[in-house]
Regions:
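Membrane-embedded helix-loop-helix hairpins and adjacent transmembrane boundary segments
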Residues: 2-577
Length: 577
């Protein structure tokens, strides 16, 4: 009888109570792990002591990688963009293959703490190191802006607090375990966060797939017939709903082939150049473990990425059927809750009391933010309250795990690459650790500002970070590993040209700087969107690097010998600091 009463009580608990319970449990777990695994040395702080197993590192890498963009925003983009959203899937997944095959083992062989550390030593120049630090900070701050917006989204809706308060709570949590634990604390915390986020993403997907198609496997349900409409496939139904409202067919793309190619390439090579992902491969003992870690991470990432298109289609179908042409007075409770956050807005333009959701902007009365689709999906499908709260806990795990990794990159770039290697080479290990933690505190404050004043929806902000990584780091790393003739003059010039052109394009065509109004798509260079321009900047980086290299002296022989050695990825280089 006691058990039955407990079950009934659990069913009757509101979403907010469930959210407090699940978020409270998971946050306690993260903080407990951070205290247990806190860093005692700079090696612990930067690379977790360099002795993490491939399985643990693979799980931590997957959590580090699957940010708020993957958990919250990717399915939201696919939900609204349909086939066009597939570029994010292709780019981000393909990037991991590139990273595992081309970069991870060689970077581990080189044996450094950070990407700017590799740049500085490979190109025998503190100027190159400084440019690397600036690029790492630009990439990381752009990326972390998306994570803090994700944190604010979840808190503002599910804990029903002000979005600014939500960001502050997230800042305090991530500050505690990132600053105290360093890479060692973050690694084990991220293993727990991966388990939370993948469970939170898959449970509602399985529920809704079974509810809509009778098939509990979302990847199969995505291509199945609807349970309540025999002989009608889910995607056919969604195509029909979309065209009825004046949108393009869900399964048809509208982006130009050039833009699709550019975005996919920018995301792929941007993945391979992300400082917070690369640094994870410095935490394992051996070169072969770096490749194993990448393989394990890729498998764990694919679980979520192969489910995202199904979640997007389920959410889009349910949203249209629930809201389109329905009286505003009878909208479900979840709609009103999201409306208070400002992420759903309804304006009754023709005063008929019905929600007109159509492609024509002049007639459309409903605006839905891309980023709420995954979070609202269980509510739209009327799943149990504990499932809705579980998604909130998963979204926070995704955002905070990546934010922690990014904050570590920022603090390491400042304390290790800037202070230790350039400003004060004689600094003690104790003072370097203090500098790293102070840098993380400052970085959290700046990240919080970006969370309160976000530059765009989560996945777009993150895609811009990938563009910056593609434009700056990827050519310098690839040429540094595979071309021993590559010298400091070429690398420095290439990185500067790449990052400056990408920044200019991003500021002009994404944020509207340099113009009174945001330029239209017709003004994009070669028809390439800001999210895809990283591929153009990357090519410019390669061209400038190789051209300048041809006109300047070759690197010292000892540097060329190091390049020869790291191309044989056996054993492991000793991490130096």
């Amino acid at each position: 009888m006691v058990m039955i009463n407990s079950i009934l009580l659990a069913k009757s608990l509101p979403v907010q109570t469930w959210t407090y319970i699940l978020v409270g449990i998971t946050f306690t777990l993260y903080i407990g792990i951070a205290i247990w695994a806190r860093a005692g040395s700079t090696k612990d702080f930067y690379v977790a002591g360099g002795g993490v197993s491939p399985l643990i590192n693979g799980m931590a890498t997957a959590a580090d990688w699957m940010s708020a963009a993957s958990f919250i925003s990717m399915a939201g983009i696919i939900s609204f963009a349909g086939y066009d959203g597939a570029v994010y899937l292709m780019g981000w997944t393909g990037g991991y293959v590139l990273l595992a095959l081309l970069l991870a083992p060689y970077l581990r062989k080189f044996g450094k703490f950070t990407v700017p550390d590799f740049i500085g030593d490979r190109y025998y120049s503190n100027t190159a190191r400084l440019v690397g630090v600036i690029c790492a900070l630009l990439v990381s701050f752009t990326y972390v802006a998306g994570q803090m917006r994700g944190v604010g989204l979840v808190f503002s809706r599910f804990l029903e607090v002000d979005i600014n308060t939500g960001v502050l709570i997230g800042m305090l949590i991530v500050l505690f375990y990132a600053v105290l634990g360093g890479m060692k604390g973050i690694t084990y915390t991220q293993v727990a966060q991966y388990c939370v986020l993948i469970f939170a993403f898959m449970v509602p997907a399985i529920f809704i797939s079974f509810q809509m198609t009778g098939n509990p496997i979302p990847q199969l349900g995505f291509g199945s017939e609807l349970a309540e409409e025999s002989n009608t496939f889910l995607l056919d139904k969604l195509d029909g709903l979309s065209t009825d409202l004046g949108f393009a067919e869900y399964t048809e793309g509208t982006k130009s082939l050039v833009d699709v190619f550019a975005i996919t390439m920018a995301l792929m090579v941007g993945t391979a150049g992300l400082p917070h992902v690369i640094v994870r491969f410095f935490t394992v003992k051996h070169v072969k473990d770096a490749r194993k870690s990448a393989g394990i991470a890729l498998f764990l990432i694919v679980i979520l990425y192969s489910t995202a298109p199904a979640v997007a289609a389920f959410a889009r179908t349910n949203m249209i059927e629930t809201l389109s042409n329905q009286p505003y007075t009878t909208v479900p409770q979840w709609f009103k809750k999201w409306e208070t956050t400002g992420l759903i807005t309804f304006v009754d333009k023709n005063n008929d009391g019905l929600i007109q959701y159509v492609a024509d902007k002049n007639k459309n009365e409903l605006v839905v933010d891309n980023d709420i689709m995954v979070l609202a999906n269980p509510e739209i499908a009327e799943l149990p309250n504990w499932v809705i709260a579980l998604v909130a806990a998963g979204a926070l795990a995704a955002a905070l795990s990546t934010a922690a990794g990014l904050l570590l990159v920022i603090s390491a770039s400042v304390s290790h690459d800037l202070i230790k290697k350039i400003v004060n080479p004689k600094i003690s290990e104790k003072n370097e650790l203090v500098a790293a933690r102070l840098s993380a505190v400052v970085a959290v404050c700046i990240a919080g500002y970006f969370g309160i004043n976000p530059p765009g929806f989560v996945a777009a902000t993150v895609a811009l970070a990938f563009g910056l990584a593609a434009a700056s780091f990827f050519p310098a790393i690839i040429l540094g590993i595979f071309y021993k003739r590559m010298n400091k003059e070429g690398a420095i010039a290439g990185m500067i040209v790449g990052i400056v052109t990408m920044l200019y394009y991003m500021l002009k065509y994404k944020l509207g700087w340099f113009d009174d109004v945001l330029p239209s798509k017709s003004e994009w260079w070669f028809g390439i969107s800001p999210e895809g321009f990283g591929s153009v900047s990357m090519l410019l980086n390669f061209i400038v690097s190789i051209t300048i290299m041809k006109l300047t002296p070759a690197p010292p022989q000892e540097v060329q010998d190091i390049v020869e050695r790291i191309r044989i990825p056996n054993g492991a280089g000793e991490a130096t600091h």
